[in-house]
């Protein structure tokens, strides 16, 4: 038996950075719903009593930035300054300009079809057979724990829960397969009247146990639930939040590499977003087709150039075909130009706010999660 451990974390939809991500993507969705060819790079900053929305947006549409911002904060559940934020009373400031003409000339042609990538950059996609959604287990189950926290908060089963929170899972692996949970760290914002003892019991029984596989839990599993003892001050009252600061939470929890570019607030002409989604689609279909047990894809782009400047693959010794053969399969079955990616996944649709909490991968209903190339790829085996 060869045991190693790996840790990933997730954060709640009420975490300050995730508030910012959701506002940025809600504004993006509102613009794309009216103007699918808009160019959007929307950044959000949140702090006590204040939201600042900035960036570069070129569009024929008008959207009410203030109303959208307040609706997002309300949906998350910040309705009182006592818990760190109040959707009704916070100030909303806007500092939005237009996309640089120097960038636009490399991205668009006269028919407003995308010619080239919106920037240079490198992106990674990853998939493995660890879970039913082809995601690493630590990040997949961390997201599920945080989603469970929000569910019990919003349905009032645990009415003392508040929006901010985060969790961290350390899993034990035996020869590359998850076999047990070593450590659970779970911190949730709460109302002041709940005792620490009652909180710990409720989190363990109502959030953790229903989500995590029973066979992975044992007497050896370590639990750290609100280990400081108190988490009443949270949200933007406790920390400022900024779009794009949770890129590892958004992707693979550190199990795969990351190119550095964030997703939220960016329209699909930005390959930081669309290129990463396409790389995930490639990796997931390769794994599902049986070509590898796990697979990491890297693509890179040059600004104004349509074709990727490079495609590479790593199957970590689990591949059933040589890497050069896999790359040829990718080039044959996947159009990785920005326009090809956008067309295949219908990325001009307003689908992005849902991705801004609980991860961009391993979820139903997202076009880059489809297994639509498996049959064609499997023929190569």
Curated annotation (Swiss-Prot):
Residues 99-109 are annotated as: Flexible loop. GO terms for molecular function: ATP binding; magnesium ion binding; methionine adenosyltransferase activity. Binds 2 divalent ions per subunit. Binds 1 potassium ion per subunit. Its cofactor is Mg(2+); K(+). Keywords: ATP-binding, Cytoplasm, Magnesium, Metal-binding, Nucleotide-binding, One-carbon metabolism, Potassium, Transferase. Gene3D superfamilies: 3.30.300.10. K(+) binds at residue 43. Pathway: Amino-acid biosynthesis; S-adenosyl-L-methionine biosynthesis; S-adenosyl-L-methionine from L-methionine: step 1/1. InterPro entries: ADOMET_SYNTHASE_CS, S-AdoMet_synt_C, S-AdoMet_synt_central, S-AdoMet_synt_N, S-AdoMet_synthetase, S-AdoMet_synthetase_sfam. It catalyses: L-methionine + ATP + H2O = S-adenosyl-L-methionine + phosphate + diphosphate. GO terms for biological process: one-carbon metabolic process; S-adenosylmethionine biosynthetic process. Its EC number is 2.5.1.6. ATP binds at residues 15, 164-166, 230-231, 239, 245-246, 266. Belongs to the AdoMet synthase family. Catalyzes the formation of S-adenosylmethionine (AdoMet) from methionine and ATP. The overall synthetic reaction is composed of two sequential steps, AdoMet formation and the subsequent tripolyphosphate hydrolysis which occurs prior to release of AdoMet from the enzyme. NCBIfam families: metK (TIGR01034). This is S-adenosylmethionine synthase. It comes from Legionella jeonii. The gene is metK.
């Amino acid at each position: 038996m060869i045991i190693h451990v790996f840790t990933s974390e997730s954060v709640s939809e009420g975490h300050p950075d995730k508030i910012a991500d959701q506002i940025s993507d809600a504004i993006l969705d509102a613009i794309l719903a009216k103007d699918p060819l808009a160019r959007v790079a929307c950044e959000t900053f949140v702090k006590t009593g204040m939201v600042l929305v900035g960036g570069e947006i070129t569009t024929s549409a008008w959207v009410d930035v203030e109303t959208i911002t307040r609706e997002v904060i309300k949906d998350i559940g910040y309705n009182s300054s006592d818990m760190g934020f109040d959707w009704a009373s916070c100030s909303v400031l806007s500092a939005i300009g237009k996309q640089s003409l120097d960038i636009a000339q490399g991205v668009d042609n006269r028919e407003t079809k995308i010619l080239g990538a919106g920037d240079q950059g490198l992106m990674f996609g990853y998939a493995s057979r660890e879970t039913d959604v082809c995601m690493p287990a630590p990040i997949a189950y961390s997201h599920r724990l945080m989603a469970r926290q929000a569910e019990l908060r919003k349905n009032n089963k645990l009415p003392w829960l508040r929006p901010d929170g985060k969790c961290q899972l350390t899993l034990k692996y035996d020869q590359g397969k998850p076999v047990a949970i070593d450590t659970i760290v779970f911190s949730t914002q709460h109302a002041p009247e709940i005792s620490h003892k009652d909180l710990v019991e409720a989190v363990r029984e109502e959030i953790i146990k229903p989500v995590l596989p029973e066979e992975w839990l044992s007497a050896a599993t370590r639990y750290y639930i609100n280990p400081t003892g108190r988490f009443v001050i949270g949200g933007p009252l406790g920390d400022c939040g900024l779009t794009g600061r949770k890129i590892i939470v958004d992707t693979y929890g550190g199990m795969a590499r990351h190119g550095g570019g964030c997703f939220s607030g960016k329209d699909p002409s930005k390959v930081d977003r669309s290129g990463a989604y396409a790389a995930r689609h490639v990796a997931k279909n390769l794994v599902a087709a049986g070509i590898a047990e796990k697979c990491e894809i890297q693509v890179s782009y040059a600004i104004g150039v349509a074709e990727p400047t490079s495609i590479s693959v790593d199957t970590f010794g689990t591949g059933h075909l040589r890497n050069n053969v896999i790359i040829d399969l990718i080039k044959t079955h996947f159009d990785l130009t920005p326009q090809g990616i956008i067309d295949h996944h219908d990325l001009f649709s307003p689908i992005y706010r849902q991705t801004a909490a609980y991860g961009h991968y391993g979820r139903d209903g997202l076009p880059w999660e489809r297994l639509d190339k498996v049959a064609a790829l499997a023929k190569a085996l």
